[in-house]
Amino acid sequence: MGKNVVILGTQWGDEGKGKIVDLLTDQASLVARFQGGHNAGHTLVIDGKKTVLHLIPSGILREDVQCLIGNGVVLSLEALLKEIGGLEDQGVPVRDRLRLSASCPLILPVHVALDQAREAARGNKKIGTTGRGIGPAYEDKVARRGLRLGDVYQRELFAAKLGEVMDYHNFVLRSYYNAEPVDFQKTLDDTLQLGEDVRSMVTDVTAVLHGARERGENIMFEGAQGTLLDIDHGTYPYVTSSNTTAGGTATGTGFGPLYLDYVLGITKAYTTRVGSGPFPTELFDENGRYLAEKGHEFGSTTGRARRCGWFDAVALKRSIQINSITGLCLTKLDVLDGLEEINICVGYQDAAGNSLECAWDADSYEEVKPVYESLPGWSESTLGVKSEDDLPPNAKAYLKRIEAITGAPIDIISTGPDRVETIIKRHPFS
């Protein structure tokens, strides 16, 4: 009897999901992406060699693991083929092991132009998008005018649909943003050619997943971004355009929620955020700089410096509820080595000192003041530790306190970037 496991972020993304997916696929037959696009950046370090993936599931570096991109993912064919080429240059047989849903919405050049024009027009109120067309592509999907991967193989119909979509968006670019329109013929020719380049990988991903389930194979679902960036449950409007939560697994692949056996929530030992938006525990002092420098907190997709802050247990508790999380994986514990004192946010207050529940709209969240509980740090190194018994006593106490506050067990502890630098207390597939 196989097990079906979801791996997702519980914070604002960048929690270290890529490493954990790569690590746990030693017991998986399939890995599926279910939302997002090439705005995600998953960094893998194997035997000291770093690989950054944006679209292709992190299981691609495991031999004999089938990788799937589900219908919930918005697809830039150009970005996908660039990523495939980079992996093939390393000797990874991507085309044999990657399959794409024919229902994936396409990201077109006009979506990228719109995304960038909008961010420029917002001035100092930027949302902080990656400018890669993700949001506009999802908008077209919801507006029912979006083009999907399977459409590319019906040339005349595709050309007609593309013309309508581009007329609409080019009008907005010219008339509202005073920006250059995107060329229709070039977009058509390029997209048709790119579609042919991936044709052998296009399939019914939902059918593939259910076939594997019926055969009793282990399946992993890989989330992108994090719960606090969810379009419905995140710090709106400073969020992404998809459902990053466990519910997105079902809608983004066609794999029903009752088939899921375990949800693993990835959380850093502290908190980070890229781009704009509220961040109650953000640090602007030496501790913040220490976390940023020691944690190498720069985005793998954009290269932008990440904002750093103390661990937010209030936000994590909400993520646990939203995702029905079975167990936690705490990453980057080693980054806290050397701090004399470590804070955990255990509550929120308003300006008058009144206790608050989670405030998920950005305006309310901006007014939140964190309530901290302080714990002693540790001077010993946790880097590369592979047994919980070998952790410093204060590091163990920190982990136990997080478990007590959130009510969720920490099943996995990451103590370094390499896949072997990990403590597994309970394997999700066991």
Swiss-Prot record:
Gene3D superfamilies in the cross-refs: Adenylosuccinate Synthetase, subunit A, domain 1 (3.40.440.10), Adenylosuccinate Synthetase, subunit A, domain 2 (1.10.300.10), Adenylosuccinate Synthetase, subunit A, domain 3 (3.90.170.10)
Pathway: Purine metabolism; AMP biosynthesis via de novo pathway; AMP from IMP: step 1/2
UniProt GO cellular component terms: cytoplasm
Chemical reaction(s) catalysed: IMP + L-aspartate + GTP = N(6)-(1,2-dicarboxyethyl)-AMP + GDP + phosphate + 2 H(+)
Single Gene Ontology MF annotation: magnesium ion binding
Major subcellular location class: cytoplasm
Family matches, as Pfam families: Adenylsucc_synt
SUPFAM superfamilies: P-loop containing nucleoside triphosphate hydrolases (SSF52540)
InterPro entries to which the protein is assigned, alphabetical: Adenylosuccin_syn_GTP-bd, Adenylosuccin_syn_Lys_AS, Adenylosuccinate_synth_dom1, Adenylosuccinate_synth_dom2, Adenylosuccinate_synth_dom3, Adenylosuccinate_synthetase, P-loop_NTPase
Binding residues for substrate: 300-306
Catalytic residues identified in the record: 14, 42
Binding, GTP: 13-19, 41-43, 306, 332-334, 414-416
Domain of life, source organism: Bacteria
UniProt keyword annotations, A-Z: Cytoplasm, GTP-binding, Ligase, Magnesium, Metal-binding, Nucleotide-binding, Purine biosynthesis
Physiological role: Plays an important role in the de novo pathway of purine nucleotide biosynthesis. Catalyzes the first committed step in the biosynthesis of AMP from IMP.
PANTHER family attached to this UniProt entry: ADENYLOSUCCINATE SYNTHETASE
Protein name from the UniProt record: Adenylosuccinate synthetase
Organism listed in the record: Alcanivorax borkumensis (strain ATCC 700651 / DSM 11573 / NCIMB 13689 / SK2)
Gene field: purA
